Amino acid sequence: NIKDSTDQISNVSIQGPESRKILEKLIFTPPTQPSIAELEWFRFTICRIENLQGIPLIVSRTGYTGELGYEVWCHPKHAPEVWDKLMEAGKKEGLIPAGFAALDKLRIEAGLILFGNEFDGQQDPFEAGIGFAVPLKTKEDNFIGKKILEERKLNPQKKLVGLELIGKEASGHGDCVHVGRSQVGVITSGCLSTTLNKNIALCRIDIQYSEPGTEVEVGKIDGHQKRISA
């Protein structure tokens, strides 16, 4: 049976190179569960805050930043206290709150895709940059779409790539990408990268223009009146 528990779960994400150290100070895991240090990618542990009588939690080694990170899951009634405990535990490491703008910038820098931007049901997984999630070799059983996906993998038409833009003007979702007069791609996401100190973007581009070092132009206004070199 499937049960909708959306209104019974709150989530706090703690991300960054010090996240493990912070959680290790705060989280109690029973002997039957993996510790924070033992958690592998995409795995979770059932645990509590501080001790056996503490707030019950699920902590997963997941996130959307490209960094070492974890997500802490609890009942909504405990969420404010869990937040306060995390902030207190992370004082020494400089833990600070961050919102969606920071999260979006980090995931673009890491090349992580967002539904509605990099894919929307009109692209196959290989065009969307998540071909690794398609078990063409590891799953022998047939599944819906397997044959066509095998064909698309062998004959890709487009590819998701990263662009470095020249100048201070940013690109945004939907901006067209050109080589000369021809449109060869579209910007799916863009931001000013704090790490690189330059504007960057994710772009779905025709396969023949997807090699690193290829020079293109991002079209603004109508795509022709104004261009940004990339």
Where are these regions (language model features)?
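Conserved, structured C-terminal
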Residues: N1-A230
